[in-house]
């Protein structure tokens, strides 16, 4: 394998890792501060113990499910479309999914 290929592969792996870390940080920020999801939801990774909405640690929702719920609202949960950007909705979905998949 050529040196250029090794460098290229290393760059791809490293850049994806940095992007994922940024998405987790933004997701946590949205969860805890901008949308204050922990007011209603329990999520151990975020230190939240809400008891109105589903316990996300137990539910273990998938990313598309989270995006749909946050965007459109569900049950008592309000829709966040127009309040959060799509990037923020995607980041909070990524954060919740990765925090509960263990």
Would you name each region that the model predicts?
Residues 1-25, 69-70, 83, 95-102:
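Post-cleavage N-terminal segment of exported redox proteins
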Residues 22-43, 58, 72:
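Sequence/structural segment immediately N-terminal to covalent heme-attachment motifs in c-type
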Residues 11, 38, 61-64:
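Amphipathic, positively biased hydrophobic alpha-helical segments used for protein targeting
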Residues 50-102:
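Extracytoplasmic electron-transfer domains, predominantly the class I c-type cytochrome c fold
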Residues 46-47:
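Short, non-ligating residues that shape and space the ligands of small metal-coordination modules
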